[in-house]
Regions:
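Gly/Ser/Thr-rich phosphate-binding loop
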Residues: 99-102, 127-131, 141-183
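Alpha-helix capping/helix-boundary segments
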Residues: 2, 135-137, 164
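Conserved ATP-binding loop and adjacent catalytic segment of the adenylate-forming AMP-binding
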Residues: 21-27, 106-113, 130-131, 177-183
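Conserved S/T- and glycine-rich ATP-binding loop of Class I adenylate-forming
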Residues: 37, 43-46, 79, 85, ...
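Short hydrophobic "strand-cap" motifs at the C-terminus of beta-strands
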Residues: 40, 82-83, 107, 132-134, ...
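Short hydrophobic/charged patches on amphipathic alpha-helices used for structural packing
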Residues: 29, 116-119, 146
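Conserved AMP-binding/adenylation subdomain of ANL enzymes
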Residues: 51-80, 88-128
Length: 183
């Protein structure tokens, strides 16, 4: 079913040319609540009915505060983003960057097909923190990438979403004994 739209369409290119309206911005800042929506994540509809799940400011703030404390994120963190920006897993890279003034590199997705080039990219950009799905990590170790190139700057590897095969996990741990691995 198509819903009618009666809002105003705004283009970034046009908005960027306008001067900021200090009064409007001040009003938003005065009236904003931590329960105000921040984003809507639309599901695929695997239950038969697609739906949007609303994430609010307080939920993201609390999540990032706790994640940052556990994984020791700070202004020196250099994230290598693997998750698409339309997927909520990207919050682990994007929001700590905003919180601390850290750095996030949006890794081109095609590099995940070429493990040696992917690790070279990590080294060129001095990426020290990755929060990736296990399949991305396993692809690097399973193809013998560490025989050619090793991530030089990693200090934190956070992973989840699937079981990390113990053989591959141990290969990562042996190759990078100084790195903190967190599931």
């Amino acid at each position: 079913k198509e819903l009618p739209f009666d809002g105003e369409i705004m283009l970034h290119e046009e908005l960027a040319k306008k001067r900021e309206d200090k009064e409007k911005l001040d009003k938003v800042r005065r009236t904003a609540l931590d329960t105000d929506p921040l984003y809507v994540l639309f599901t695929s509809g695997s239950t038969g009915m697609p739906k949007g799940v609303v994430g609010h400011h307080r939920g993201v703030i609390d999540y990032i505060d706790q994640l940052s404390a556990v994984l020791d994120f700070d202004e020196e963190s250099v994230f290598g983003n693997q998750a698409p920006l339309y997927f909520d897993a990207c919050m682990k890279d994007i929001y700590p960057t905003l919180k601390f003034g850290a750095t996030t590199w949006l890794i081109p997705h095609e590099l995940f097909l070429f493990p040696v080039r992917l690790v070279e990219y990590l080294n060129v950009h001095k990426i020290n923190t990755i929060c990736w799905v296990v399949s991305a990590l396993t692809m690097i170790s399973a193809f013998g990438t560490f025989k050619e190139v090793v991530p030089e700057y990693l200090r934190t590897v956070a992973f989840g979403s699937e079981v990390f095969p113990i053989r591959q996990f141990n290969l990562w741990k042996r190759t990078l004994p100084q790195v903190r691995f967190t599931n």
